[in-house]
Regions:
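A general "terminal functional-core" signal
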Residues: 1-201
């Protein structure tokens, strides 16, 4: 919440919330996957109440569907929520979108990045949010529990893409929230590189 607030009052354009537990599986009346409170939904509610900010766009690139976030925000037309997961869904108003994650192929990183760009870029540009939130899980890396065959290149590429998307859609305002991932060796490899790219973009 503090990271989001610093963006909204103009102290910073981008912030990384190094959360110790997940949030996107916590819904209105359920929780799972070590997610007890939905950090993103709580931050949105706070920013609306404290700062009058209305429109938010979320890209969830955790390997698993953000079912809790969707449960809370499903009927909110001022939140664009896009998940790259194993599902395929578009709400009637186009603000809630699930796309199947690409699997296999010769270059999983490139396929994943192209999917993220194709599904999010045009939507967020048209939606014009006040703030973009990237729910960043690294559990899709090779060998983690959500293995999509991805490497460091995919996550660094996503960071570059999100900085550019935020710059075009909402004046660069981007909050990155750490999501799933279980291996400390991968966390040590990936997270510092992503933070560096977010800071240098």
């Amino acid at each position: 919440m503090e990271a989001a607030q610093k963006i909204c009052v103009g102290e910073v354009d981008r912030a990384f919330a190094f959360i110790g537990a997940g949030g996107h599986h916590a819904g209105r009346s359920f929780f799972g996957g070590y997610c007890c409170f939905n950090d993103v939904a709580i931050a949105i509610a706070h920013l609306r109440k404290a700062h009058g900010i209305r429109r938010f766009a979320i890209l969830d690139t955790d390997a698993h569907h953000g079912d809790g976030t969707r449960d809370i925000l499903q009927d909110d037309p001022d939140v664009l929520h896009v998940c790259i997961c194993g599902m395929n869904y578009v709400s009637a108003d186009g603000t809630k979108v699930d796309v199947p994650a690409p699997w296999g192929g010769r270059d999983p990183d490139e396929s994943y990045l192209k999917t993220a760009e194709s599904v999010f870029a045009s939507r967020v540009h048209a939606f014009r949010p006040d703030l973009i939130i990237w729910y960043f899980g690294f559990d899709g890396h090779q060998g983690d529990y959500g293995d999509m065959g991805l490497s460091l290149r995919a996550f660094v590429g996503l960071a570059d893409f999100m900085v550019g998307a935020a710059r075009e859609a909402c004046g660069g305002k981007l909050l990155t929230v750490l999501g799933g991932g279980s291996r400390t060796d991968l966390a040590t490899l990936i997270i510092p590189k992503v933070i560096a790219r977010l800071g240098n973009g």
